[in-house]
Amino acid sequence: MQLHSLIASTALLITSALAATSSSSSIPSSCTISSHATATAQSDLDKYSRCDTLVGNLTIGGGLKTGALANVKEINGSLTIFNATNLTSFAADSLESITDSLNLQSLTILTSASFGSLQSVDSIKLITLPAISSFTSNIKSANNIYISDTSLQSVDGFSALKKVNVFNVNNNKKLTSIKSPVETVSDSLQFSFNGNQTKITFDDLVWANNISLTDVHSVSFANLQKINSSLGFINNSISSLNFTKLNTIGQTFSIVSNDYLKNLSFSNLSTIGGALVVANNTGLQKIGGLDNLTTIGGTLEVVGNFTSLNLDSLKSVKGGADVESKSSNFSCNALKALQKKGGIKGESFVCKNGASSTSVKLSSTSKSQSSQTTAKVSKSSSKAEEKKFTSGDIKAAASASSVSSSSASSSSSKSSKGNAAIMAPIGQTTPLVGLLTAIIMSIM
């Protein structure tokens, strides 16, 4: 009797184990979906809850009010939520990886999006989300990030991200702060037309290819050492720029129309590969903080009502110079001395203050003033005319050169044209929008 009981118990255990195995094997670890799979209701999303991995591209839209993608850990493809005008919240907190892109676009009443476990994605686009107040993720790896036309007050979903190709944040009018641990930016870091009190903090950033900041209130880049291409500050409410560890800018360095700017501190900056443009910063009376700058590979262009310009270590300007101040207290003596020693090359040298003007036609191949046989020097008592950059010029130029994934391939050709505009003979009239476009295009 005991033997029969033991045999029966063993048989029951084997049967249960086989049933469990059969049940487990019926749950697929990977589910292939069509390249254009769509979900318009929660029941459509529930079909994927038995899959660890989705292979394909999933688009969510329609009349969905709240949405959740449960249990899925990986998408080998893209996840797009588009034009779901009734959607108020979405969560995919098991999702860890998306091999292509995460796109949230044209979701007019979406208030929150939660991707709490998401660590890796190729690109993220948060575009036209006028009601969103919360975006959660644990992103550690992303190539491209675009955040545009949202109501986010802060960007907190990237606190673990260390490197990125493109980080573009624009037209988020409620934005007040961005703090990021990113260490390298291999393409471009751009912030434009966000809230006018936005504070930018990238204190771990060591190297970037391009940085462009517009309509920013304060910035902190405590450890930035090198800009491979260009750096631009245009139409900000910044009061000071402190980049004390920065030593090299590969192309253009522009500081334009920052009305509240009073102080510059670039004490370690020694080389600018392209143009240095400092124009129409009305509060910047004394231009200093460039004490160790020795070489400007392009044009030196400084325009405003400044009383002093301290470039005491400057040895070489390769693209000519145009320095114009409305103040009669500004002296051109230091720049004229540098030009006479052959330190300023290019097409022309112009230096004006409120009382006098000096203009020299240069030979771009000459090595010194003494070797020139056709140089003409003219002086007059006419007052310097200010080159004024308006907000309309700035926005028109910025609009013409805005970053988008579709225009990335053409940006290099536009940039080369922009550099040509910057390098035009300074003695000639340069259209303001053209100059600003050139500046902005060169830092994209």
From Swiss-Prot:
Residues 359-418 are annotated as: Disordered. Residues 1-19 form the signal peptide. Induction: Positively regulated by cell integrity signaling through MPK1 in response to cell wall perturbation. Induction is dependent on transcription factor RLM1. Disulfide bonds: none annotated. It is a lipid-anchor; GPI-anchor. It comes from the Eukaryota. One of its GO terms (cellular component) is fungal-type cell wall. GO terms for biological process: fungal-type cell wall organization. It is found in: Cell membrane; Secreted, Cell wall. A lipid is attached at N419 (GPI-anchor amidated asparagine). Has a partially redundant function to ECM33 in cell wall integrity. May be involved in a repair mechanism activated in response to cell wall damage. This is Cell wall mannoprotein PST1. It comes from Saccharomyces cerevisiae (strain YJM789). The lineage of its organism: Eukaryota, Fungi, Dikarya, Ascomycota, Saccharomycotina. The gene is PST1.
